[in-house]
Amino acid sequence: MTHTATLISVDTLTAAQAGAVQAIPPAFPLSATVAVNPFLGQAGHSLPDTAAVLGKTAGCATTAPRSWFAAEIAAGRITKPAVAEALAAAGLDWPVDKVISAASRQRPAPQALPTVADLAGASEAPGWPAQAEARIAAWVAGHFDQGQALWAAGAPSGTYADWLAFATTDMTPDLAGLPGFRAWLKALPSDPTEALLAAVNTLGLTEAALPLYFHRLAMSLGGWAQAARYRLWQAELAGQTDTTLAELIVIRAVWDAGTLATRPALAAQWDTARAAFAAPVTPSEDDLIDAVLQDAAERSTQADLAQAFAPVAKAEARPALQAAFCIDVRSEVIRRALETCDPGIETLGFAGFFGLTAAHTPTGSCNSEARLPVLLTAGVTSKASGDHDAARITTRVTRAWGRFRQAAVSSFAFVEAAGPFYAGKLVRDTLGLGKADAIPGKPVFDPPLPEEAQIDAAATILNAMSLKSNFAPLVVIAGHGSHVNNNAHASALQCGACGGYGGDVNARLLADLLNQPHVRAGLAARGIAVPEDTIFVAALHDTAQDAITLYADDLSEAHRAAATASLAQARQWCAEAGRLARSERQPSLPGATERDGIAARAQSWAETRPEWGLAGCKAFVVAPRTQTAPAQLDGRVFLHSYDWAQDEGFGVLELILTAPVVVASWISLQYYGSVVAPEVFGGGSKQVHNVTGGMGVLDGGTGALRIGLPIQSVHDGGSFVHDPLRLTIVVNAPQEAITDILARHDGVRALFDNGWLKLLRLEADGTISERYTGDLTWEAFAPGTEAAQAA
């Protein structure tokens, strides 16, 4: 096979390839799943621009169906004034009624530009696109395997090289009606960049067509592209690089080129498609209308949210109990419930890793868990107390037994011989009566932190929590986790700020740190006087069962004795708060008929909806708790405690806006994407999932890796339970401080400037005073005023 010279330079080619790689978000493995913004690669673009691009590269919507907007308008939840405001913000001189009437008409579904495989499927070989997907998936599943496969693939020599070795011996394409495909592949260069040049030349692509075409190829790979992007994400955190996704794009381009080379009858159709890839991409009128409707829905929600805030109130008396929870929206319900138990209870909200970026090694493990936000790298290491050697032996025996049960030959004998002995376990698991997990050993820093570093960490964390005075006798540091059964996506219900693990380790490390006498002395020298009778105790909030477990055994004997009465009272309050929270949540859980049956329900191995996770999230409030305490926010708002008057230099505010807010945006937009485009950004149905490679799930036995939230996480069987709204950030801080932070952080500013996050400013008197409009500018927040006149 010969190739004519290409006019496209290697630099141009690799730049377009790198752009396509950056357009794809990472997908984290099932063992530590965290929410990822599916529009991460489009953060620098507006919603209508993104709709235009993803319409051509993925054939997906980027907003809810028009029918959803029409229903919201009919119910009065989207108002005409809000539509008028959204039109003005978009710079569109359209009548409001044009947008309102458009909501009642469903727009044509976006159609992705066709690849050569698509053209072959439409004209000559109907099953060819699925065949291409299946053959690439069959290879890539083994290539990406993280230890699940019993017959592992050989040592990798490079993504493209490994695939080429597989593909040139795979006879499936020939049998599927593409004779000569393998022969064409065998003539390809062994270097991936040279192979990509050869493919581009065969396809006749121009420089203008490359960015959109490569993006289209990456999107056609589904979750496999995101799994590959994860490898690059991890490498970049370590200051390195990874070419897996870039080489997957080579593989997909080669597949197209080979199809065209062996089916020349497709040339005329491909000429038309190739021209479309090279054409400028601009939003259509439908894209603009959808963006206006989306903005109007969010403005209407903000108008309602503005009624929820109260003036700042200063606490006079010493609290009876303080409890710091994760900012997770699920904490809002139990925090509110706990506060009703006694007027002396005060709760706080803080990112659930509690300021400790810990790489933690559980008992018996050789691998560490990154219990920290995925935006950060580990700063400390820790391990669980206990006999690690004995635990490792137990772990290895358990793993070996599991391998025996699953092996190709022994699995049949195992089922025949040992199956009846598992009957009792099957019954217990079906009824949700399995044994509770044992509490892991107390975590300790390993190696120990130097004393000065301990004091630095304690002071930084308490300052960031706005907790520097008026300490209660007992302060609970409550991480959160979710104990569920038979759930491949269990880690997605854990703490996102802890990298998809529970927050118990971080909470226990911090509580122990704050109880150390030398740390207390060091804090006092820095102006943070913790009373001698104040004791910190860690806890775990189980979000599936709304139960709070105090880790009192972590305390020293002296502290346990001193806090006996406080601990007993705290347990009573926590139990009552759990009962109230379960009572509030029960009506929203399908099939949950008894308030106290939620715990057993969460442990049922047949339950596809053990809890709703963060479904419904709509806002993130950065303010003193007293401003939100009177409101019932229905578990839909992230609550981060913050007092700007204590934040000299606004370093804490900068940390909040650049870390927890960004993580929350990933969470919100993952739910958003899983609702508006479940076929592309959703995780499919749990009822047909098969775990593959330990990193993701397939619908059935092959095909694209499903990334995002399963339909059961956002849909109750009758309707969606998550409103597709972009997150509104409400901040009580001076405008100048917020603007200055945005000016210094381009990535965060892009989220606000392009509308992926909304920003409002809250005053001390409980009123929303300003709305951020982009480009470091603000406007007065007066929902409906000017718009009503325009309407």
Swiss-Prot record:
Keywords: Cell inner membrane, Cell membrane, Membrane, Metal-binding, Transport, Zinc. The keyword Cell inner membrane applies. GO terms for cellular component: plasma membrane. InterPro entries: DabA (IPR018752). Zn(2+) binds at residues 326, 328, 480, 495. It is found in: Cell inner membrane. The gene is dabA. This is Probable inorganic carbon transporter subunit DabA. Its cofactor is Zn(2+). It comes from the Bacteria. Disulfide bonds: none annotated. Belongs to the inorganic carbon transporter (TC 9.A.2) DabA family. One of its GO terms (molecular function) is zinc ion binding.
